[in-house]
Amino acid sequence: MEKKRSYYALLIPTLLTVWLACAGHSCARHAKAKPPMAGPPRCPNCGPMVVPYPLSTGPTCGDQAYRINCVGGKLYFGALHGSSYVITSINSVTQRIVLRPPGLASSVSCISADVSKQGLELDPHLPFSITSSNTILLLNCSQAMLQAPIDCSPTSLCYSYIKNNASPCSKAPLCCTFRTDGSQTAYTIRINGGGCLAYQSFVGLNPNKEVPPPGKKWPDTGLELQWALPKEPVCKTDVDCNLLLGKSKCLPDPTSLGLKRCSCKKGLEWDPVNAICGKCRHGKHCKKKKKTVVFAGAAVAVVGVTLAIAVAVIGTKHSHQKVKKDIHKNIVKEREEMLSANSTGKSSRIFTGREITKATNNFSKDNLIGTGGFGEVFKAVLEDGTITAIKRAKLNNTKGTDQILNEVRILCQVNHRSLVRLLGCCVDLELPLLIYEFIPNGTLFEHLHGSSDRTWKPLTWRRRLQIAYQTAEGLAYLHSAAQPPIYHRDVKSSNILLDEKLNAKVSDFGLSRLVDLTETANNESHIFTGAQGTLGYLDPEYYRNFQLTDKSDVYSFGVVLLEMVTSKKAIDFTREEEDVNLVMYINKMMDQERLTECIDPLLKKTANKIDMQTIQQLGNLASACLNERRQNRPSMKEVADEIEYIINILSQEVTET
């Protein structure tokens, strides 16, 4: 023993010396790091106007998602339906551009020049939106516009504008004012179909100041848009990234299948304003950017603590097994307390390991009915004849164990006809088990896409709508009625079970999260958490900023709606490379005005005119759910209400016939 002590006494200072030498060498190397390279090429000026990155006027500069046009020394912004507007100013710091509204079609009419295109409509899939700094004047309106938040009263600003600047509109029946300040960003200013035939817009009009008196000039008209900060440049190989950003790698973009982007090397991070790999200021890659003294001090502490732990482990090796058993007992006790504390007391109970082992025939593979990344599901028959489904974490999978325990916390607090019912829990085996009601008719995924072991009768359009409505109701209950609110976080067609009457039951709450409103900023319902879910269904905003909200579930449900309309999988590698992701595929078909080609042929074969109308309506609802900006997506309650409205259209048609 004395020899061992002498050995450690010599070993510790030797290791410290070697470690410090290596640390000093490493820090010296880091001190000689090259400065970051310039970013992607900025487009040349267009006449007198500077074109900042990421705006792009050509295929070799800027970011192609931010296309604008340079024609005759002027910049133009292209909207949908072939409309185009002059850009009067650009602010690269605030990422905003101001457009010139079209004005009236003639000097004697009160009709907008773009009335044939029904006003300004932006492509919601592009990174531009209308800001909240605009005051919109709606001219030549019908009585249908007399509702809040539109102001059509005699004191409305638009009447003052008509007197000064738009005399052709003085004989029009109504004019109204709409302030976008404080509202959500939008993509549309509608005229014609919305009850008005003309519009004008002003940026930053102060409502607390009087408008110009008669005879005085109003400020110039303008409509302000904002662009979202750009992602890293698109690439094909590392060579592209070296040319654009220096030492960066070309890696797959997790939010866009088939697309690759440059990823800055460690110690640097993407600066979307200056379009460079700049000095790292936050995030996990910044941890190496420490001063030499701090690094060396940390090294000393780490080595010392590590050696101390090593000596302690040698001395306590023989007591390890006893400690492990004690920990297991404590975990079992914690599970029991958690179940009894959260249970509604109606039907949830604790099952014994002996009961479950017998019911599953010792977890025979013959009873295995499902498996996933974290767990397995077995069919089981209890002693009273009740058929159940039993979920078990995989052996040595701590994430699976955590998810099953999380599922207990969630399901013990909810009760809804469209949510799978938890019968109880088993806590005295090595792995925790959940016992559910057995749902016999497979999953929505299997009914839409088929399964290897069973043939399913195709779902009718009316049945698909009922399943969509029931699922939306269940999710709306989690978001709104449950206290605290619950976000599912893994909504997909394979997690929607169908009973013997083809009614929907939402299942698999392993990734779900309870929302503690007391811990979220300003009492808003969002959670910061590592992105988890299923590829093809994952909300891109959640993936980018780790902010989980109820709208993350809405996005995932939008993908499910697309599956119902098309009978195509969310991710399918048998499709062309650019079409692997269903959302991207549908967006492409919409741009090409070929959306009807995507509808499930079995639906089209039997659909009448009303069916096709409601199929289109559900497709539009799916598109709203999939809006890239979460604030523009409907709530799950609104989704359920819209599906109910669509179902009522079909019901009225049946009644009339």
Curated annotation (Swiss-Prot):
Chain sites annotated for binding ATP: 369-377, 391
Residues forming the catalytic site: 490
Keywords from the UniProt entry: ATP-binding, Glycoprotein, Kinase, Membrane, Nucleotide-binding, Serine/threonine-protein kinase, Signal, Transferase, Transmembrane, Transmembrane helix
Chief localization: membrane
Membrane topology of the entry: Single-pass type I membrane protein
Positions annotated as glycosylated: 140
Ranges for domain Protein kinase: 363-646
Subcellular location: Membrane
GO cellular component, one term: membrane
Domain of life: Eukaryota
Any GO MF annotation of the entry: protein serine/threonine kinase activity
EC number: 2.7.11.-
Catalytic activity: L-seryl-[protein] + ATP = O-phospho-L-seryl-[protein] + ADP + H(+); L-threonyl-[protein] + ATP = O-phospho-L-threonyl-[protein] + ADP + H(+)
Signal peptide: 1-23
Transmembrane annotation, as ranges: 294-314
Alphabetized InterPro entries for the sequence: Kinase-like_dom_sf, Prot_kinase_dom, Protein_kinase_ATP_BS, Ser/Thr_kinase_AS
Cytoplasmic side: 315-657
SMART domains: S_TKc
Spans within the Extracellular topological domain: 24-293
Chain's role: Serine/threonine-protein kinase that may function as a signaling receptor of extracellular matrix component.
Family listed: Belongs to the protein kinase superfamily. Ser/Thr protein kinase family.
Official protein name in the record: Wall-associated receptor kinase-like 20
Organism: Arabidopsis thaliana
